[in-house]
Amino acid sequence: MPSFDVVCEANMIEVKNAIEQSNKEISTRFDFKGSDARVEHKENEITAYADDDFKLGQVKDVLLSKMAKRNVDVRFLDYGKIEKIGGDKVKQVIKIKKGVSGDLSKKIVRLVKDSKIKVQASIQGDAVRITGGKRDDLQSVIAMLRKDVTDTPLDFNNFRD
C-alpha cells in the first residue's frame, strides 16, 4: 500500500549557509562597524547578539533576508525573549522547530478523516504517516494539507509504493 510521512523540519544545511552569509554581511556593513553584532548556530537554535535592541532588530532582518534567499521558510523559527548580557549588549535565542507537534498532528489526522478520502492517518512520534490504496488519493491528501495547514511549513517525504 502506498504511504508517505508528513514532517516539519528545516534544511539545516541551508540554515547554516544563511547564518554564515548573515555574519559576513554584518561584518562588512558600515552601521555595524565597531559593534559586537553576530549570529551563532548550535544544533537546533540560533543566537543573535547585538549592542542594543535596534541593532538586534537589524541583525534579525539580515538573517531573515538571507534565509528567504536560500528558500528556508521563516515559519520554522520560534523567537525567544530578548535578554540583556554584560554591559549594554543584548541577545535573543531563536529555536528552530523540528517535528510535528502533538496538536498539529491531531489536527492533520482530523483533517484527513474529515476529508472522506479513503486513506488512514496515524501519528508516529514527530511525524504523521498517511497510508492509502491509491497514489491519487495520497496526492489529493497532500494538496488538501497544503491548502488547509498554513501556520506551519509541512514537508512530505518517505514515499513508499
Curated annotation (Swiss-Prot):
The keyword Nucleotide-binding appears for this protein: yes
Highest taxon of the lineage: Bacteria
Gene Ontology molecular functions: nucleotide binding
Record GO cellular component, one term: cytosol
Keyword line: Nucleotide-binding
Protein family (similarity comment): Belongs to the YajQ family.
Biological function: Nucleotide-binding protein.
Name of the protein in question: Nucleotide-binding protein Bxeno_A3642
Species whose genome carries this gene: Paraburkholderia xenovorans (strain LB400)
